[in-house]
Amino acid sequence: MERRTFLKLAALVPGLALAGCGGSKTLLSPKDPTMLSIWHVYGEQADSPMNRLLTEFNDTVGREKGILLNVTNMTNSAAIGGKPGALDLPDLFSAHSADASALGIENLVDWNDWFTAEDMAAYVPGFVQDGIIDGKQVVFPVSKSTQLIFLNGSQYARFAADTGAQLSTLATWDGFFEMAGAYRQWSQDKPFCALDYPLRLVELNALEQGSGELYKGSWYDLTNETFRTSWMEFARALVQGDILISDLYSNTQVMTGETLAGLGSSAAILYYNDFVTYPDNTTEPTDLLLAPLPHAAGTATPLMPQAGVGLCAFKTTDQKAEAAAVFLRWLTE
């Protein structure tokens, strides 16, 4: 249950069944376990959710098939960068596509050798495509995210009952700012939403309205009227107190009742509690609600950002590649 919950909350891509090596005889043996070292970025603490998942794998499928994953809690990429004095390279590691390309795709396992096209079709196409370099699936989509609006459902229910507000209004930025103003008036000057990445939102809104190139030299092109208009929409709402910029991450403002909503990475759902604790120490269920990232009204090019990393494997032996593929199947099923 914990594994499925973690995967859902981390916004992992849908699962699939493994069909590696075209159904050939396995190279794995529980009598002679295959050892895999892994570096990951999902929390450096020993008791991180990812480390608990790896322990669960070792105790179940890993023991059954003869695979043992050894976690190295290290975020320093000096070894992968080939710098002197670094530790031995891991068998499996978290990486962005740009990192994988820099390492040389000839040095990495092509996951297409271990998963069929039908298998990969079960994944979000954009996430899969992001890990393909020169026709090879060298980054396996594991932890991906976009941006969402998170709302305190208990507070929203009262707001909606009094004002007739509807979540569908948040589909556009016009509706978002309209609801933000209405909430501030209803709540006696409390901001509606905390934003984690306000500049990125300004950019996306402008691009959806056909702004074209946003930069001139090393900074924004302030003569770009579409960009200026988008900027002013957010600036006006900030000055009026309809929204605010988060303190690091918007879930803090939502969990303390400072704002009704937070707009940030979908992976932030890991950090939302079951209860909101208000300044007077009263609590109530969060009843978390989600809404998609708003878009510019009438846009012909709606944009959805994606972020996150996948898993790569250094090319060593087919035995280790098969073991890595078995682990990925388990992780994403």
Regions found by a protein language model. Name each.
Residues 65, 279-333:
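Extracytoplasmic/periplasmic substrate-recognition and gating elements
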Residues 177-181, 217-248, 293:
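Glycine-centered hinge/linker elements that transmit conformational signals in sensory
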